[in-house]
């Protein structure tokens, strides 16, 4: 808030809780949360994965899933960014169309408010960018097709 003017310049206030006494409550001197997370992962002192995403509150969910897809499941960059995603925030869960309906039902049965998107690559998800570097210094990159620029993939 600009002193003397009393208004904010962007929608970052939507991440605060308007109710008093809660962890995310609005209050003097509090800064808004931002989720900008350009990230690099190293192994044996060498950069192995470089990744980030625009997408507001969905950034953290997307980056954890993309990174896990590469590190734990051995996916290529394209496979990692195009795999089905889930984003959870508060009591709401957004699932892309390709998330199995039995898993969606399980989330609903656990009391979650689930939105099962009609789209396989939903714009409710953040748009991850990813470069994976192998031991021979070959680059495998992908740009999430959920965004307007589509999918870019290069491997050399």
What are these regions (language model features)?
Residues 1-118:
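Proteins synthesized as precursors that undergo proteolytic processing into mature forms
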Residues 75-76, 92, 102-120, 124-156:
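Terminal-appendage/accessory-domain detector
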């Amino acid at each position: 808030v600009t002193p003397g003017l009393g208004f904010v310049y962007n929608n970052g206030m939507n991440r605060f809780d308007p109710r008093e006494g809660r962890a995310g409550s609005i209050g003097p001197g509090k800064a808004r949360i931002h989720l900008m997370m350009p990230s690099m992962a190293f192994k044996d002192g060498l950069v192995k994965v470089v990744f980030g995403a625009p997408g507001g509150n969905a950034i953290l969910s997307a980056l954890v899933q993309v990174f896990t897809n590469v590190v734990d499941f051995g996916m290529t960059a394209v496979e990692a960014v195009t795999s089905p995603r889930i984003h959870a925030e508060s009591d709401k869960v957004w699932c892309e169309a390709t998330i199995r309906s039995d898993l969606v039902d399980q989330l609903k049965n656990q009391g979650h408010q689930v939105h099962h998107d009609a789209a396989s690559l939903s714009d409710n998800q953040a748009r991850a960018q990813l470069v994976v570097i192998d031991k021979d210094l070959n680059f495998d990159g992908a740009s999430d097709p959920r965004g307007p620029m589509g999918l870019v993939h290069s491997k050399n």
